[in-house]
Amino acid sequence: MDPPSVRSKITEIEGDLFHAPDGAALIHACNCQGSWGKGIAKAFKDKYPAAFAIYRSHCQNLLSSPRYMFEPDLQSEESHARSSRDVRLPEGTALIIPPQKRDSEANGKKHWIICLFTSRGFGRAVSPPDVIVRNTELAVADMTRQLAELQTDQSSREESVGELWSCRFNAGLFGVPWERSRRVLEDAGLEVTVVRPHGG
């Protein structure tokens, strides 16, 4: 008999992601090109320009000085594929951006921004859905690891990550059915409030 898997507590609500409580971390999926040009990414860029500058710089550094990580041969329930590959960073990773003073002053709340790098490109160059799901598995695992490190290191920080809030990432312009990404989140063992727009 298989041991029970750790399931996270996913709560889905209708509303505005940006109304998350002070100190919350807002999770969304990103491309690796440094562009938040459409969809919810554009809303993030408009609301958190200082965080966008950090994201863009992170992408530009890795575009100009490529680095890779080796993804071992693994098969998940979700990806259905077995193959090893070299993944060009930041693809398959997470970037956790602490609240930026300029953004917090403009918005009245301190929000952490978590970028999950799930697609290499965007628009016509968006990665295929199965690649996005595999990258989501890697990025959520990386996010979970980084959050654990931040939690153990919080004694030396003024601010710690509060609640985790998320949009239905990958389901918009990346075109991956939400259920596939939700399954990855459920397997991560985290408590996340997922916000969908009113009527969405």
Curated annotation (Swiss-Prot):
The region annotated as signal peptide is none
For the protein in the UniProt heading, the enzyme class is hydrolase
Q: Which domain of life is it from?
A: Eukaryota
Name the PROSITE patterns on file: MACRO
UniProt-annotated binding residues for substrate: 15-17, 29-31, 36-41, 169-175
Residues spanning the membrane: none
Q: Name the catalysed reactions.
A: ADP-alpha-D-ribose 1''-phosphate + H2O = ADP-D-ribose + phosphate
**InterPro entries, A to Z:** ADP-ribose_metab_enzymes, Macro_dom, Macro_dom-like
Q: Which GO terms describe its biological process?
A: DNA damage response; purine nucleoside metabolic process
Q: Recite the UniProt keywords alphabetically.
A: Hydrolase, Protein phosphatase
E.C. number(s) listed in UniProt:
3.1.3.84
Q: Which GO terms describe its molecular function?
A: ADP-ribosyl-[dinitrogen reductase] hydrolase activity; phosphoprotein phosphatase activity
Tell me the ranges covered by the Macro domain, including all copies.
1-200
Q: Which CDD domains match?
A: Macro_Poa1p-like (cd02901)
Q: Name one GO cellular component term.
A: nucleoplasm
Concerning PANTHER family, the annotation shows: ADP-RIBOSE GLYCOHYDROLASE OARD1, PROTEIN C6ORF130
Physiological role:
Highly specific phosphatase involved in the metabolism of ADP-ribose 1''-phosphate (Appr1p) which is produced as a consequence of tRNA splicing.
The family assignment reads: Belongs to the POA1 family.
Name the record gives this protein: ADP-ribose 1''-phosphate phosphatase
**Source organism (scientific name):** Aspergillus fumigatus (strain ATCC MYA-4609 / CBS 101355 / FGSC A1100 / Af293) (Neosartorya fumigata)
